[in-house]
């Protein structure tokens, strides 16, 4: 949608005024920013008509001509084995401190280029197109800068739609995970977070394209399942050494386990040191490799190359029964 000229609504401002008494402009009711940031109806926003056409051309460059073809492979000139040393120092020492997941994306994709989908809507999760060694991928990433990267109703809808789109057009999925949980709250429960969150699990489990998951920090409980864990069909799972893979945070778990223990503080510290790592999960086969952050790009590219011939046979169905 184009700012200032594009508008969409079921009933216009005059009808809204006559029925509800609310005064609202056409731009505020159904303008470009309204549908890009509040309703989620529009996926992209443009400054003017020329910018809109340029964005359409750029988007089509990532996509195949139809669902029977593969996405085009482009020579981007970026070394597939390139490593960015800055990634090793990106995450803050405090595991509860925020960082910008876009910094990770820019460091690992070809030439740092990506195309955001619904950039202004549900900012706690990122959905974008990018390339690895010239191959189009769809990236789904938690954004710790907003709501600590928690999944909520809008984030679940946004990511589910994107996952299914990528699967429909044979575009591999790369998932960057730093998720502490589903957003708690009365309004989330009343709004059906269980039903909306289930859409993500359904979309991932239904997708037959290659799926590569990289855990950067937190991967807790059901929210990690919803971000394409191995159990949801991830073909390859990599974890940074900073990863915490568990049902809940180790500090919270220790407070429950040792709440009546006289040496609670010491045992809590020992528990956190032992379990706030990806190595227990790796021992059990839930993680394929623990990697240095700077190695993320070559590992993802190698995984995608290995999965290039992946094919899954599914029962013929008219359509699946997603929990709408």
Task: Identify the residue ranges that each predicted region occupies.
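Ligand-binding clefts of soluble mixed alpha/beta catalytic domains
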Residues: 1-324
């Amino acid at each position: 949608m184009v700012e200032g000229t594009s508008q969409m609504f079921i009933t216009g401002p005059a009808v809204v005024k006559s029925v509800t008494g609310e005064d609202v402009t056409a731009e505020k009711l159904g303008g470009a920013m309204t549908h890009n940031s509040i309703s989620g109806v529009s996926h992209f926003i443009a400054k003017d008509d020329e910018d809109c056409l340029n964005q359409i051309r750029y988007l089509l460059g990532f996509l195949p001509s139809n669902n029977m073809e593969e996405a085009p492979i482009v020579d981007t000139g970026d070394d597939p084995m390139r490593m960015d040393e800055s990634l090793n120092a990106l995450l803050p020492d405090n595991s509860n401190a925020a960082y910008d997941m876009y910094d990770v994306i820019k460091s690992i994709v070809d030439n740092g280029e990506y195309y955001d989908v619904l950039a202004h809507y549900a900012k706690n999760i990122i959905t974008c197109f990018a390339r690895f060694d010239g191959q189009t991928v769809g990236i789904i990433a938690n954004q710790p800068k907003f709501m600590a990267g928690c999944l909520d109703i809008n984030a679940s809808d946004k990511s589910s739609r994107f996952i299914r789109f990528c699967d429909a057009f044979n575009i591999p999925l790369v998932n960057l995970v730093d998720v502490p949980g589903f957003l708690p709250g009365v309004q989330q429960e009343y709004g059906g977070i269980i039903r909306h969150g289930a859409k993500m699990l359904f979309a991932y489990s239904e997708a037959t394209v290659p799926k590569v998951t990289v855990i950067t920090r937190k991967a807790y409980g059901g929210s990690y399942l919803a971000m394409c864990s191995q159990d949801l069909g991830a073909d390859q799972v990599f974890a940074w050494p900073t990863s915490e893979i568990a049902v809940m945070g180790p500090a919270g778990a220790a407070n429950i386990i040792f709440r009546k223990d006289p040496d609670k503080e010491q045992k809590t510290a020992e528990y956190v040191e032992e379990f706030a790592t990806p190595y227990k999960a790796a021992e059990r086969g839930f993680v394929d490799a623990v990697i240095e952050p700077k190695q993320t790009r070559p590992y993802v590219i190698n995984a995608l190359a290995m999965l290039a011939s992946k094919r899954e046979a599914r029962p013929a169905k008219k359509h699946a029964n997603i929990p709408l």
